[in-house]
Amino acid sequence: MILGVGESPSEGLRKGVVVNLEKTISAIQAAAVAAERMAGQRIESVVVSLGGTHTWSQNSTGVVAVAHPDHEIGEDDVHRVVEASRAISVASDRQVIHVIPRAFTVDGQDGVRDAVGMTGHRLEVETNIITGAQTAVQNVIKCVHGAGFDVEDVACAGLAAGEGVLTSQEIELGVCLVEIGAGTTNVVVYNEGSARHLAVLPVGGNHVTSDIAIGLRTTLDEAESLKLNYGHAVPDVIDQAEKVEVRQVGGDRIQALPRRFLAEIIGPRMVEIFQMAREEVRKTGFDQLLPAGVVVAGGGSRLMGTMDAAQSVFNTSARLGHPIGLAGLADKAYGPSFAVSSGLVKWGAHSRADHSDMRQAVTFGNTYQKTVRWLRDFF
């Protein structure tokens, strides 16, 4: 249940990466204080999202012999085979963030979802391994500790958004999540119950705002207001006679411009974002295997016409991703902007509910634990 919500401008971050420690720490503290005040409780630990184009995914496999004398597969065998899949070449400046099992194979029988309890001699696994830049990960954790909180778990922003807004049926059937943030866009492809591919695009809602500011010669604040109140991702649906008032740079001159002109600035950028996302789907080979279509979330999805643009580019159905499965302050945290944060709440709840160490080992692994211990010693 959601008890409190806090928001703060993400100063100190650029495209999901920390560029100023002090400003990032202050932003975390401001959001936390607001949430604590609303909830009437203190925050001790947090689940943190990792964003930025430094995160990407690759496929891997692992193979082990079943250890038990009766050849019944146990959780320890699953743990070993998942760990075996981690044996990939990773650059010294990168670290494994998540290892996501997709399917197991037992003595040649593939497509096994849960191998525990089955009988076999040879256990194989296909995994999706997500890595990130060590310094980027450490800087995020360092900021959270600097704000006075323990890090309970870490999740890539795209996976957290999926946890927040996707249904289990969509994940099973096949769906593409496009989470449009401020500086980046997360693209995650799901099929048969798991994440198959993750990518972070270097464009987001701030790029749309910047395009408007340049095209209309106005301030970024005015451009953001125009985008949210009058913007549209599909220019052709806007009446050519409709006007919007634009305050020019300097603040003295107000000019009436066609609203369609505003949409003609916005439209190409939104199409570009969806075309880049579609290319990521094509790379996976799942472009024809998305019966559940596309789910668009994030602050950038609040723009009018976004679903129409997504449907046009992907040539499939599209819906707006609202947080689901959370009780409490629904009106405060129901919008698509809360896709990642709502997913982090559910991520943390699942992590606590799982009393074994398997989920932590599978998702973030020993490298994260070493990073957290090092940062605790540092502080």
Would you name each region that the model predicts?
Residues 1-177, 194-196, 205, 216-263, ...:
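Nucleotide/phosphate-binding catalytic cleft detector across ATP-hydrolyzing
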Residues 50-52, 177-184, 190-193, 202-206, ...:
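A short acidic Gly-Thr/Ser loop motif
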Residues 60-61, 189-191, 307-309:
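Short amphipathic alpha-helical segments
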Residues 251, 255-326:
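C-terminal structural cap/anchor segments
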Residues 162-163, 173, 180-188, 197, ...:
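Short glycine/serine/threonine-rich phosphate/pyrophosphate-binding segments
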